[in-house]
Curated annotation (Swiss-Prot):
Cofactor(s) the record lists: Mg(2+); Mn(2+)
Protein name stated in the entry: Glutathione synthetase
Family matches, as Gene3D superfamilies: 3.40.50.20, ATP-grasp fold, A domain (3.30.1490.20), ATP-grasp fold, B domain (3.30.470.20)
Pfam families: GSH-S_ATP (PF02955), GSH-S_N (PF02951)
Organism of origin: Brucella melitensis biotype 1 (strain ATCC 23456 / CCUG 17765 / NCTC 10094 / 16M)
Length: 312
């Protein structure tokens, strides 16, 4: 059955189709005969209890520089849609959170993927702390003294914003580095929220693995190797993707978290693993499926739509 699918995303014109997961999901939906509509979070509204968006009919093509066509914008009641993909990139701020409040008014009559209530209640750097034995030692605080004590205990640490994304604002403080006090002052000025200190994992030099799960089951992975001059492995900041298989430890991690993902209705999830430790559970806008398909041919977008269609 053909579905009406609205994609809530950053504007399609800004997408780098080579590595964009939202674009891959849209291509697969179109291939299956589903009708695509596009809108950005700024076009989402609620009036007298009716949730609507100014949507444009969308066609996509896997052609760099000519990857989309949009129709005329029309305001539509979103309950007329069968599926909405919640796919704008973080930051996970009040603007993002407000969209989840609006979309939960129409879910599950209109299936919103991922479930907006659980997206709001599962920030990736906090959700992961439900599995402390799978993580490196981690501190969430805004108390500078707590961070300094943590640093004395572990030496090498990572300091990063609680709601950042794409590697922005992530710092590696090696044992003996004298910049901690200045960084804490800067974080206190830039962020109202607490931030994260985490024991530095030397295994990151061999890569930070992104594992994709569909309905709580692992379906593919890629390794992201940091450059020689950077502590971060995110592809947004120059991390090099390479083909990877799951290790027994990574399968153990997936088996542990899978039931919680299913319970919360998370269809598409990306987790980050360094060595033997999970560092994040990404439920907002996980990426990596285009790279995985290029490496080993796994069409994760098809597995995603199989799971979505089974719910309609």
């Amino acid at each position: 059955m053909a579905l009406k699918v609205a994609v809530q995303m950053d504007h399609i014109s800004t997408v780098n189709i080579t590595g964009d997961t939202t674009f891959a999901l849209s291509l697969e939906a179109q291939k299956r005969g589903h009708e695509l509509f596009h809108y950005t979070p700024d076009w989402l509204s609620m009036r007298d209890g009716v949730v609507s968006a100014r949507v444009e009919k969308m066609e996509v093509r896997d052609v760099k520089g000519d990857h989309y066509t949009l129709g005329e914008p029309v305001r539509r009641d979103l309950t007329e849609m069968d599926v909405i993909l919640l796919r704008q990139d973080p930051p996970f701020d009040m603007n993002y959170i407000t969209t989840t409040h609006l979309l939960e008014r129409i879910h599950p009559k209109t299936l919103v993927v991922n479930d907006p209530t659980w997206v709001r209640n599962s920030p990736e750097k906090i959700f992961v702390t439900e599995f402390p034995d799978l993580m490196p030692e981690t501190l969430i605080t805004k108390d500078p003294q707590e961070v300094m004590d943590f640093r004395r205990e572990f030496g090498d640490i990572i300091l990063k914003p609680l709601y950042g994304n794409g590697g922005a604002g992530v710092f590696h403080l090696a044992d003996g580095d004298r910049n901690l006090t200045s960084l804490l002052e800067m974080f206190g000025q830039l962020f109202r929220e607490p931030f994260i200190a985490q024991r530095y994992l030397k295994d990151v030099r061999a890569g930070d693995k992104r594992i994709i799960l569909i309905d709580g089951e692992p379906v593919g992975a890629l390794n992201r190797v940091p450059s020689e001059t950077d502590a971060r492995s995110n592809m947004h900041v120059g991390g090099r993707p390479e083909q990877s298989k799951l290790t027994p430890r990574e399968r153990e991690i997936c088996a542990r978290i899978g039931p919680s993902l299913k319970e919360r209705g998370f269809i598409l999830v990306g987790i980050d693993v360094i060595g033997d430790y999970m560092t994040e559970i990404n439920v907002t806008s996980p990426t990596g499926i285009r790279e995985i398909e290029r490496f080993d041919g796994t069409n994760i977008a098809a597995l995603f739509w199989d799971a979505v269609e089974a719910r309609r």
